[in-house]
């Protein structure tokens, strides 16, 4: 019953958890009178967990169901009073035997748990299962169609995700991931990077009592192999954890690209057929620990080391039909060796001051990443004569220092402040050897930030949170090369032109405000409005004036060191409704972005009587976009769950000077998952995601989708499990694009219409078997430090405590 009104609570959840194995055994929902009768319970020792949305959880234990002793074989829980939670809700948790999906006021949390289709996979497989999140065939992560996403690991940037600000998740094993947090509109407390949102991947640190571990192995088609192991030891004062992983396998893909150039008096064409085999070998090791000087404080350290070796072999076949017949039936091949490693150090401290009112967090992290890429390429004409052979060797490094301190103080039940400061120092560099000549590209970015956020609950149902963040950014880029600029081809000409303009400096400061309003409609329905200012800073690829590829002269692309950051004003309205059986979340957002960074600045460069098309990043004038998204999770019975999500967007970009930038894009995305758990028999999971037909500024992208199937059988009291799965059942995970646009050659002033059709597939349908074995006590502590202050997140799991 309600502790205040004494009225019965309908649909309250009552779960019986086996204390010995810490497993959900049975449960149910109360009727309209608040009554529930559970029968057929196996004998044993249990804890009863009583929950309802908007109320504080209550546990009753121990319940000893043994004949002749303990509580007997019948047990009456009696009258249970639940207290209403405050307006600042912690989380709404959808509990079950399968992976747990948690919807809080400001973010979505996906606990990887026993997710089947991502078992033995990577971070990309995990993210594809999260509502409104997509990972395309190139590894680009987007939220509701927006690819300006910041990827974090344990709340910080990591070498595991690569040197780019957006990051890559393919190198993170799914077995190392505990949960994923998706934050679409965070407050001024957090970095403003990521107009589309923030994805925080939280790695496992060990939450089970005593000595525990896990070993898993995967074998699949195309020589796919995966071996992972995690071990942790936890006591009242200490938590030690370590993990290692190895992953390899061939990724076979192909593609076609067709161009037509329609002039007023003729039509030229170019056809390209591509085949590619990529074989990555990834090895990783992670070790760390948490020391608890008191019940309120934690001191932690983590060391993360990983290395990769990757071989990529590509073959391109060109057939050209042009006016001068300069290029006819050419075969082009490349071989790329990519060897790299990274090392991350993170030292963290947290103190809750023996209260629920104060919290101090601080951390220092250092990340070092190196990447050595050796590329060899050549081409042959239709007469099998060697037309061009060259080699490129690039050594890249990326160093990141991050220092942060955050303090929270809740002066009263309805008033709190958050204040903090953060320094981020980044140093990127590339040493490039091309045709025996040495070139250098160094880029430094230092960010100094401070913030203040205030939360005020006006009533039990209405609250607000306002904040401001100040940033000072210092950037500097410098290029170097041969003292004599003696260009030998179009590539060296682009190099020399960029070096002549070096160095490039762009210091700037900015204020980032945020404001959030929360209204609690009912005990299980909430309405929230949020506003924040975001930034998408140019990354290394969009800044570097050196060509991204020195092999394929038909697709020249380079960055622009004069790029300005793009700024967005983001407004979002969210409605959420949560009950034991049904959870609904709907949101709509509006973004107004200035100085949009795009890859559509088309220029023409002439060298040795040949004109080349060069695609460069540039700032468009303005972009306005609207977005709507929603997800539903329905549990018709305790052993089954259905999750469905969808999103759509519409964006319009304009620029007064560059017609290449003008245009409209829109599209929709969708996904879902069905989970069936038949006790003592098996678990079945069917999942899928995709996109509808997209319109972009220059054409269309046809619809595509992926469907995955997984079946798992457990043995030895759930310690051993065998999972069989098929990824992309219909082999439909392809990328197709069809474009047309009007082009004017700035050198010859000749106009034509360019038509392009392209189709690519990076990974074919594949099947695999995964073995997983858990050892040790496999039981959570009865008392958990993460619940000490009643706050969510914290350092224990690398989560981001977002409040609203």
Question: Regions from the language model: what does each represent?
Answer:
Residues 284-308, 332-482, 486, 520, ...:
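Face-selective signature of the C-terminal outer-membrane beta-barrel domain
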Residues 219, 223-254, 266-314, 341-345, ...:
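Transmembrane beta-barrel wall of Gram-negative outer-membrane proteins
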Residues 273, 391, 400-404, 438, ...:
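Outer membrane beta-barrel strand-and-loop segments of large Gram-negative receptors
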Residues 370, 427, 474, 481-494, ...:
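Surface-exposed extracellular loop regions of Gram-negative outer-membrane beta-barrel proteins
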Residues 123, 129, 156-184:
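Short acidic/polar hinge/loop motifs at secondary-structure boundaries
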Residues 79-80, 123-124, 165-168, 182, ...:
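N-terminal periplasmic accessory domains that precede
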Residues 19-35:
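Short, acidic Ser/Thr/Gly-rich low-complexity loop/linker segments typical of extracellular
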Residues 4-5, 13-17, 51-53, 70-116, ...:
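Short, acidic, small-residue-rich periplasmic hinge/interaction motif at the N-terminus
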């Amino acid at each position: 019953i309600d502790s205040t009104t004494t009225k019965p609570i309908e649909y309250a959840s009552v779960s019986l958890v086996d204390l010995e194995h810490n497993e959900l055994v049975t449960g149910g929902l109360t009727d309209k009178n608040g009554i529930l009768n559970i029968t057929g319970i196996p004998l044993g020792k249990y804890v009863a967990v009583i929950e309802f949305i908007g109320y504080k959880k209550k546990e009753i234990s121990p319940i000893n169901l043994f004949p002749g002793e303990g509580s007997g074989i019948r047990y009456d829980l009696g009258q249970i009073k639940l207290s209403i939670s405050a307006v600042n809700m912690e989380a709404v948790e959808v509990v079950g035997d399968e992976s747990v999906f948690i919807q809080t006021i400001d973010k979505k949390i996906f606990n990887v748990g026993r997710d089947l289709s991502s078992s033995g996979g990577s971070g990309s497989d995990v993210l594809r299962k999260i509502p409104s999140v997509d990972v395309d065939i190139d590894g680009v992560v987007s939220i509701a169609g927006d690819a300006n996403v910041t990827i974090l690991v344990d709340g910080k940037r990591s070498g595991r995700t690569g040197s780019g600000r957006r990051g890559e998740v393919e190198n993170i094993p799914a077995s190392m991931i505990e949960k994923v947090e998706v934050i679409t509109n965070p407050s001024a407390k957090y970095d403003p990077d990521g107009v589309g949102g923030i994805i925080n991947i939280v790695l496992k640190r060990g939450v089970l009592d005593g000595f525990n571990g896990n070993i898993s192995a995967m074998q699949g088609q195309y020589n796919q192999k995966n071996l992972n192991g995690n071990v942790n030891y936890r006591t009242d004062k200490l938590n030690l954890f370590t993990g290692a992983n190895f992953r390899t396998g061939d990724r076979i893909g192909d593609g076609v690209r067709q161009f037509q150039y329609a002039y007023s008096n003729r039509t030229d064409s170019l056809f390209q057929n591509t085949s590619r085999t990529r074989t990555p070998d990834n090895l990783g090791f992670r070790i760390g620990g948490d020391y608890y000087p008191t019940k309120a404080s934690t001191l932690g350290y983590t060391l993360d080391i990983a290395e990769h070796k990757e071989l990529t072999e590509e073959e391109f076949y060109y057939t050209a039909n042009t006016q001068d017949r300069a290029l006819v039936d050419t075969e082009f091949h490349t071989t790329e060796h990519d060897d790299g490693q990274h090392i991350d150090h993170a030292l963290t401290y947290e103190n809750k001051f023996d209260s629920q009112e104060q919290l101090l967090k601080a951390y220092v992290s250092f990340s070092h990443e190196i990447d050595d890429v050796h590329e060899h390429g050549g081409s042959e004409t239709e007469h099998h004569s060697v037309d061009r052979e060259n080699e490129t060797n690039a050594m890249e490094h990326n160093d990141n220092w991050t220092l942060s301190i955050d303090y929270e103080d809740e002066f009263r039940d309805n008033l709190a402040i958050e204040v903090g400061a953060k320094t981020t120092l980044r140093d990127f560099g590339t040493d490039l050897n091309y045709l025996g000549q040495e070139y250098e590209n160094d880029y430094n970015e230092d960010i100094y930030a401070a913030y203040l956020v205030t939360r005020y609950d006006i009533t039990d149902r209405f609250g607000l949170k306002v904040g401001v963040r100040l940033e000072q950014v210092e950037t500097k880029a410098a290029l170097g090369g041969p003292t004599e600029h003696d260009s030998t081809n179009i590539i060296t000409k682009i190099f020399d032109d960029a070096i002549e303009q070096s160095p490039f400096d762009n210091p700037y400061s900015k204020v980032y405000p945020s404001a959030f309003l929360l209204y609690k409609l009912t005990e299980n329905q909430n309405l929230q409005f949020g506003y924040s200012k975001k930034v998408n800073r140019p990354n290394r690829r969009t800044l570097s004036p050196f060509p991204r590829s020195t092999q394929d002269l038909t697709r020249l692309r380079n960055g622009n060191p004069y790029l300005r950051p793009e700024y967005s004003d983001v407004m979002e309205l969210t409605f959420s409704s949560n009950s034991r059986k049904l959870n609904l979340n709907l949101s709509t957002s509006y973004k107004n972005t200035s100085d949009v960074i795009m890859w559509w600045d088309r220029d023409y460069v002439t060298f040795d009587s040949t004109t080349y098309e060069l695609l460069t990043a540039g700032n468009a004038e303005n972009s306005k976009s609207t977005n709507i998204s929603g997800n539903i999770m329905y549990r018709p019975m305790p052993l089954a769950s259905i999750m469905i999500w969808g999103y759509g967007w519409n964006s319009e970009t304009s620029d007064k000077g560059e017609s290449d930038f003008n245009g409209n894009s829109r599209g929709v995305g969708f996904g879902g998952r069905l989970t069936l758990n038949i006790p003592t028999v098996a678990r079945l999971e069917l999942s899928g995601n995709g996109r509808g037909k997209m319109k972009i500024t220059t054409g269309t992208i046809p619809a595509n989708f992926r469907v995955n199937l997984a079946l798992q059988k457990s043995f030895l009291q759930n310690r051993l499990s065998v999972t069989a799965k098929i990824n992309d059942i219909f082999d439909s995970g392809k990328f197709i694009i069809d474009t047309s646009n009007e082009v004017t050659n700035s050198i010859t002033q000749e106009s034509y219409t360019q038509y392009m059709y392209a189709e690519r597939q990076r990974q074919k349908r594949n099947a695999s078997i995964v073995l997983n074995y858990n050892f040790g006590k496999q039981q959570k502590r009865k008392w958990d430090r993460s619940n000490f202050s009643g706050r969510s997140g914290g350092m224990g799991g690398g989560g981001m405590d977002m409040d609203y």
